Regions:
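Cross-family detector of peptidyl-prolyl cis-trans isomerase
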Residues: 1-128
C-alpha cells in the first residue's frame, strides 16, 4: 500500500473511501476475497476511464480485453500504481486521480485535456 497518512471517510457502511496525501481518492466498491496486489506483482484488470464531466475516454470492456501491467513499475500513470495496490482479486475500486498523478499539464493523445482529473473504475481480475 501507499505509505503516508491516509484519511478515511465512511459515508456508507459498505463503501470505504480513502484520500491519500497525494490527492488520490480511492473508493472500494467491492472488496475482493482473493490475493492482494502489491508492488512487483503483474496485475490483470478491467477498467473504464472518464473525465470529470462524464465523458468516457477509454474502456477495456469495449475491447473485451483485460489490461496487464507490473504494479509499482512505472508502466502506468502514478494514480494507477498507487490506487491498484492493496486491491484483492475480485475487487472493484473507483479511483479519482488528480492531474499530477495522471497525465499532468501535457494531457494525452488529444483525448485527455491538460490538467484533467480522471475517474476510473478498476476491477482486479488476476495477479501473478
Amino acid at each position: 500500500m501507499q505509505s503516508g497518512v491516509r484519511e478515511q471517510q465512511l459515508s456508507d457502511p459498505f463503501l470505504q473511501k480513502e484520500v491519500i496525501m497525494s490527492g488520490l481518492e480511492i473508493e472500494d466498491q467491492i472488496v475482493g476475497d482473493g490475493d492482494e496486489a502489491a508492488a512487483g506483482h503483474a496485475v490483470e484488470v478491467h477498467y473504464t476511464g472518464w473525465l470529470t464531466d462524464g465523458t468516457k475516454f477509454d474502456s477495456s470492456h469495449d475491447r473485451n480485453q483485460t489490461f496487464s501491467f507490473k504494479l509499482g513499475g512505472g508502466q502506468v500513470i502514478a494514480g494507477w500504481d498507487q490506487g491498484v495496490a492493496g486491491m484483492k482479486i475480485g475487487g472493484s475500486r473507483k479511483l479519482t486521480i488528480p492531474a499530477e498523478l495522471g497525465y499532468g499539464e501535457r494531457g494525452a493523445g488529444g483525448v485527455i485535456p491538460p490538467g484533467a482529473t480522471l475517474v476510473f473504475k478498476v476491477e482486479l481480475i488476476g495477479l501473478s
